Amino acid sequence: MEPTKEPTMEEKLQAVIALCEEGDPEMCAFLGKEFYYGWNVPQDLDRALRYLTVAAENGDAISQFTLGFMYWSGRGTEPDLDKAYELFLQAAEQDVPEAMYNVAKILLTKGFEKNRDEAMGWLRRSANAGYDAAYDMLSDLKDAGAGN
C-alpha cells in the first residue's frame, strides 16, 4: 500500500478557495486575511477585498474591521469614509475594541457628521476593553478640555 501523499500548499489553498466559493464564510475570512497580509500566499489586495467582503457580509467581526480599514485607508480600494464607518460600527457592535476606537475617531473627524457624545462613549468602551490607544485619546481629550 502506497503511503498517503501530503497535499501541497497549492492544493490546500485550492481546497480552501473551493470551500469559500461554496459559501463558507469562515474560509472566506481566512482567505481574506491570508491575501491581505500575504501570509502563505503572495499579497493580493483585490482578492483580500473580495474574500473579506463575503465574510463581513456574513457577520465576521474581524473581517468587518479589516475591510473597514481598507476603505478608510484606501488600501486595495478607493477610500470611502462612510463605508469604513459602517464596517467599523458593525465590528464595534461585536465588541472589537480597535473598531470601537476607529468609530470614535471617524465621529470626531472633520467633515464627518460629528457626534461627540457617541464618540466619547465608543472611546470609553474601547478603553474599558483594554485598548491603550483609546485610553490615550481619552486622556488627551480630557487634557484639552474636550473629554468631560
Language model regions located:
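Short helix-capping/linker turns of helical repeat alpha-solenoids
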Residues: 22-25, 37-39, 57-60, 73-75, ...
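Alpha-solenoid helical repeat scaffolds
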Residues: 29-30, 65-66, 81, 98-102, ...
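Terminal, low-structured helical/coil segments at or just beyond the last alpha-helical repeat
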Residues: 125-148
